Regions:
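Hydrophobic-ligand binding "helix-grip"
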Residues: 31, 40, 54-101, 109-111
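Short beta-strand/loop motif that positions the catalytic acidic residue
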Residues: 363, 369-371, 375
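A conserved amphipathic terminal alpha-helix motif
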Residues: 108-150
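Active-site loop/oxyanion-hole signature of alpha/beta-hydrolase fold enzymes
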Residues: 168, 173, 194, 198-201, ...
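Hydrophobic ligand-binding cavity/cleft-lining segments
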Residues: 1-43
C-alpha cells in the first residue's frame, strides 16, 4: 500500500470570513451529494458527522480532529463507510487569495490497497470539486453576518464563595447546579479566582463551575512546604470531591494552564476536556540555565525589598494588549498588588522547577487552546504550534485553537465575549 494525496482549490470573490461562515459547521448539510446529515458524540465528547449520499445505502461517519475559527480551518478523519480504506485524513482551509477574496483548499491523505486507493482518490477529488462549486453558488445567496453564539445566556443565581480544609485552606468561587462534571478554572501567577467571574457566569447554564484560589492566593493559604505540581493536582482533586464531581473540565490561564496540563498527565481519566489559555508547557521545555535565569530575573525586585504591589505597574505593559480598557487595567493591577511576597516566591519556584516534559500522547480528551492576539508571553504562533503538536501526537486528537482578537496575555479579561463564545461552544459539545 502507498499513500495517496488529493488536493482541490478554488478562488471566490468574497471575503474569507463570509466563506468560513458557510462551511464552519462540521455537520452542515450544504454539499450537493449529501442526502441526510446528523451529529453524534462518542464517549469522550468527540464530534462525529453521520451522513448518507444520494443513490447509496452506505452510512458514513467522520470525526472532527481539528477546528479553528481564527485560522478558518478544520480537519477530520474517516471512521466508517469508505470500503477498503485503512487511513483517511482530510482538511478544509479558507484563506486569503492575492485579489482580496477567498481561497478554498481541500486536501486528503489516504492509505488503501492498490487499485482501491486510486478509486478512492478519484472519488475524493470529485467530491472536493463539487464542494467548491457549491460554495461559490452559496456565496451569492443571503448569508449570516456572524457565527451563532451560545455565550450570552444569563444565569440568575449569584456566585458563592467559600473555603474548606486546614493547611492549606482552599478558597473557591462556585456557581451552577450540582452535577457529575465540574468546570474548574485555574488563574495565572499574577491573578486570583475573581479573574474568572465572567467565565463562571457564562458556563454555569451548562455545567457547574468553580474558580480556585491557588495556594497562598486570595483567600487560600500556603501549605506546610514549598508548593509543587503534585500538591496542586491534589488540590484539584479535593475541590472535585468537595463539589461531588467525578469528571472535570480544567480551564487554566498561563501558570494555571501548565498546572492543568500537569493534571492531564497524571489523571487523564478524570478529565472530560482541557482548556489552555495563554500557555501550556510552562518552563518544562526550557534548559535548566534558562529556567534559572528566568527565576533570578523575576526575583530581582524581591531581593531589592519590593513587593508585588511595588512592581505590578511595571508588569502591566508586558501582560496587556494595546487596547486594554482602564477598568481591566485596574482589575489586573488589583490582582497583582494583592499577591503576598511569600506566595509570589513560592509560585515562582514551582514554575521554574518542572518535574517533567509533557508527553502529549497522554492527551486523551478534547483540548481547546486560546491565546491573545497581542500576548507577548504566549504568542499566537507559539500556542498554535503547541496545538499542532497535540494534534499530531494525541492518539485520537480533538483539538481546537483560537486567537482572541485584541487581547494580551490575560485574554479572558481583555476580550471576554470572544473568549466565552469559544469556551461555551466547546463545553456544550464535550459534556453532551
Amino acid at each position: 500500500m502507498a499513500w495517496k494525496n488529493v488536493i482541490a482549490s478554488g478562488d471566490i470573490p468574497v471575503s474569507p470570513e463570509l466563506v468560513w461562515l458557510l462551511v464552519r459547521d462540521f455537520c452542515g448539510k450544504w454539499h450537493p451529494a449529501i442526502s441526510t446529515m446528523g451529529a453524534e458524540h462518542d464517549k469522550s465528547g468527540r464530534l462525529l458527522r453521520v451522513f448518507t449520499v444520494h443513490s447509496q445505502d452506505v452510512v458514513y461517519r467522520e470525526r472532527l480532529t481539528w477546528f479553528s475559527d481564527s485560522d478558518r480551518s478544520m480537519s477530520y478523519t474517516h471512521v466508517e463507510g469508505i470500503h477498503g480504506v485503512e487511513i483517511y485524513n482530510a482538511q478544509l482551509l479558507v484563506s486569503n487569495n492575492k485579489d482580496g477574496g477567498a481561497r478554498i483548499t481541500m486536501t486528503a491523505k489516504l492509505l488503501a490497497p492498490d487499485p482501491r486507493d486510486e478509486e478512492i482518490a478519484i472519488g475524493t477529488k470529485k467530491i472536493f470539486d463539487e464542494a467548491i462549486i457549491e460554495i461559490k453558488k452559496l456565496t451569492k445567496l443571503p448569508m449570516p453576518l456572524q457565527a451563532p453564539s451560545n455565550s450570552n445566556f444569563a444565569y440568575d443565581k449569584p456566585i458563592q464563595t467559600f473555603a474548606f480544609g486546614d493547611t492549606p485552606r482552599l478558597a473557591i468561587s462556585h456557581i451552577g447546579e450540582p452535577s457529575e462534571t465540574l468546570c474548574l478554572f485555574l488563574h495565572g501567577i499574577g491573578g486570583n479566582k475573581s479573574n474568572w467571574n465572567q467565565q463562571l457566569a457564562s458556563v454555569a447554564p451548562y455545567v457547574q463551575s468553580a474558580a480556585l484560589d491557588l495556594r497562598g492566593y486570595g483567600e487560600s493559604t500556603l501549605g506546610e512546604i514549598q508548593s509543587n505540581v503534585d500538591e496542586y493536582c491534589d488540590d484539584i482533586l479535593s475541590v472535585a470531591d468537595r463539589l461531588g464531581a467525578l469528571n472535570l473540565v480544567l480551564c487554566g490561564l498561563s501558570y494555571g494552564s501548565w498546572i492543568a496540563t500537569s493534571f492531564a498527565m497524571r489523571y487523564p481519566n478524570r478529565l472530560s476536556a482541557l482548556v489552555l489559555s495563554g500557555g501550556c508547557t510552562g518552563m518544562s521545555e526550557a534548559l535548566p540555565e534558562e529556567r534559572e535565569a528566568f527565576r533570578l530575573s523575576r526575583e530581582v525586585p524581591i531581593n531589592e525589598g519590593k513587593t508585588p504591589a511595588d512592581f505590578s505597574e511595571d508588569l502591566l505593559p508586558v501582560i496587556s494588549g494595546p487596547d486594554i480598557s482602564n477598568a481591566i487595567k485596574v482589575e489586573l493591577l488589583n490582582s497583582m498588588q494583592a499577591i503576598p511576597t511569600e506566595t509570589y516566591i513560592d509560585a515562582l519556584k514551582c514554575f521554574t522547577n518542572p518535574v517533567e516534559k509533557f508527553d502529549f500522547s497522554k492527551i486523551t480528551m478534547p483540548v481547546l487552546l486560546m491565546t491573545g492576539e497581542h500576548d507577548k508571553l504566549a504568542p499566537p504562533d507559539e500556542i498554535r504550534g503547541v496545538a499542532k503538536r497535540i494534534f499530531e501526537t494525541a492518539p485520537e486528537p480533538d483539538v481546537r485553537f483560537e486567537c482572541v482578537t485584541g487581547a494580551g496575555h490575560v485574554c479572558n479579561l481583555e476580550n471576554p465575549n470572544s473568549y466565552n463564545t469559544a469556551l461555551v461552544d466547546f463545553i456544550m459539545r464535550v459534556i453532551q
